[in-house]
Amino acid sequence: METKIVKTHTGKIYVDIKNRLEFLTVGDYGKENNIKANFLGLTKEINGVANTEVDLSKKWVATISTQKGCPMKCKFCDVPKYGFYGNVSIKELSYQIETIIKNEEVKQTERFNVHFARMGEPTWNKNVLDFSLILKDLVKKCGLKAETVHPVISTMLPKANKNLKEYILKWCEIKNEFYNGEAGLQFSINSTDDEQRNELFDGKSLSLHEISELAKELPMPKGRKYTLNFPVTAQTILDAKKLSMLFDKSKFIVKITPIHETNSAIENGFEVSGYSDYDVYRKFEMPLLNEGWDVIVFVPSKEEDSDRITCGNALISYEKKRDNSNGND
């Protein structure tokens, strides 16, 4: 497979045009620099994140694609501009991890996180479940000694997926038993208003009531709790009391991030700001804390968005360059 590499401030984006794959490796600035989480003892408000050197030997994040493009049509994401060309195979999932590891000199890390969150909705692809069972051995086979291998599934909860509950329950079993709690599950909630959610997810996600009913069937998490993810803008509706009625605080935490500055987010009128001002996060965080929620606020650096590390951008850019070089518009 022929893969191009795009260097970013925090890592690399890999682009395989022929096989329609895009995947990402990044280091981390350190949780004390880009995370506020009172329940973890990280109580300092983050007013801007400085772009500094990252240390892969501490924490290394690989974000890989589970589909070639995506069938979801989320209004804040650029991947729909690329199209959808099917699921990624186990061989292609392995290839992404192998490529990420072999292109770095680091051979030992405290933590290797694998996010199934690049292009695609992972719950449409059963290969992700099977792959997670060989992931730890694959990492070792690639020559990386990782004290912890921590895979994470992030889902938009597609309502057309009739096997969604079965899939998520299987993932919970893998998280709790095979990984002994060292794995993650994130639900993309984004709003506590169904009308706003329908706009964001183009009507393709379950309703809040349906997600709440599904959440009740999840086993108690071992290790880390499950995550309710809220990429926020100034327009986001996040009613802390309603969230408390819908979800169990003993099972879930809340994660607040900004919506990334994608072309689609800008075109659809989302206010994508807040990288250097904690006020935009505080107004969502405080009511949740008052309701007794464990809350993580993740603040990226402005450079991370300027790198266009969000899903699909590098692949779309290379496709345009190729088309232009072939004389196409």
Regions found by a protein language model. Give the residues of each.
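Auxiliary Fe-S-binding modules of radical SAM enzymes
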Residues: 1-40, 207, 213-329
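N-terminal [4Fe-4S]-dependent radical SAM core
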Residues: 1-66, 88, 93-108, 327
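Active-site micro-motifs of SAM-dependent methyltransferase domains
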Residues: 31, 72, 121
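Core AdoMet radical
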Residues: 56-63, 69, 78-218, 225-234, ...
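Disulfide-bonded cysteines in secreted/extracellular proteins and peptides
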Residues: 70, 74-77, 311
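Short acidic/His/Gly/Ser-rich catalytic and metal-binding motifs that mark active-site loops
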Residues: 72-74, 194, 263-265
